[in-house]
Amino acid sequence: MTLHTIENRACVAFGIKDVRQVQQPLTYAPDEQVLVRIARGGICGSDIHYYQHARAGMSILKNPLVLGHEFIGVIDAVPTGSRLKVGQRVAINPSQPCNRCALCLEGKQNVCRSMKFMGSAQFDPHVDGGFCEYVAVTEQQCVPYAEQAADRVMVFAEPLAVAIHAVHQAGDLVGKRVLVTGSGPIGCLVIAAARTAGATEVVATDMSPRCRALALQMGADRAVDPSDESSTAPWGEGGGYFDVCFEASGAPAAIASTATFTRPKGTVVQVGMGPATVEMPLGLLLVKEVKVVGSFRFVDEFATSVRWLESGRIDPLPLVSAEFRQDQVVEALEMAGDKSRAAKVQLVFA
């Protein structure tokens, strides 16, 4: 197998509050991999956690890690016979399942136990992400999109795919009443996806007035402070008001509240990553026969997300708080970590 090596400038996390611009070699197989010059990236919660705490959930930083799993770019080189073309603009799916295990063969690649997810410290060695000048990926990871589509829109492909998968986990939403608890970037994209999927009423909650305002911009009919009991109490009357609750905050109180607010035979979709254990009113879930399902990453929804963004079916731009150059990555991470100021912060590479 022939290997090529190029110089690559990357945003590398070394430890707590230690992210640096590093010039390092990128070795790739030109006969097997697609070389993509990165144009833009979006900072996600996990990037912030690696920066602030050197860990994201159970994934602990043991070695330097190139951050980023939300990124798009322009193809620089392709293997002979590829369906892709040099100069084509692509969104890159950061998922790299094994495609051999029973789960993958059943079409459940998002829960593959050997998943190599770009920008993740789950495994050692870690899997580098896309906050760099170039990445080498498989052809299957590249989803082309139209030249006229805006980069700042298309870089939402990965988080919107998460939201679309959550909506798919809920089943048919046509005519349904929906609650979304937590109106951060993912919660707001769930709001937009639920509305697109036919929900007749979408209500959002968040403690932050800024987040509630964004929820309204992204399609919520109402946005409520969850501490305002005069607004939330009616949702528990008559056994529960909402057909589907999407829990996107990970906050224990919000997680528990979904059992009260969901009507009998309704569905709770857990999207937010909360603590390892939480208290849940199981009695309510039992007697109301509420179905609780998890939602983790995505499968085919990544391609769907690209098409929705490309066609303007969903406009994510209200969520963009700021843009920074690659060499301003520390400032970008600082702002992204300040939830009083930022929803989605983007990095511009080219």
Residue spans for each PLM region:
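N-terminal Rossmann-like NAD(P) cofactor-binding module of classical short-chain dehydrogenase/reductase
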Residues: 91, 246, 269
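N-terminal Rossmann-fold NAD(P) dinucleotide-binding loop
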Residues: 187-188
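Glycine-rich phosphate-binding loop and adjacent beta-alpha segment
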Residues: 252-313, 348-350
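NAD(P)H dinucleotide-binding glycine-rich loop of Rossmann-like/cofactor-binding domains
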Residues: 98-181
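Glycine-rich beta-strand-centered segment in the early N-terminal region that forms part
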Residues: 27-41, 55-105, 146-149
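C-terminal hydrophobic helical "lid"/dimerization subdomain
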Residues: 2-10, 256-257, 299-350
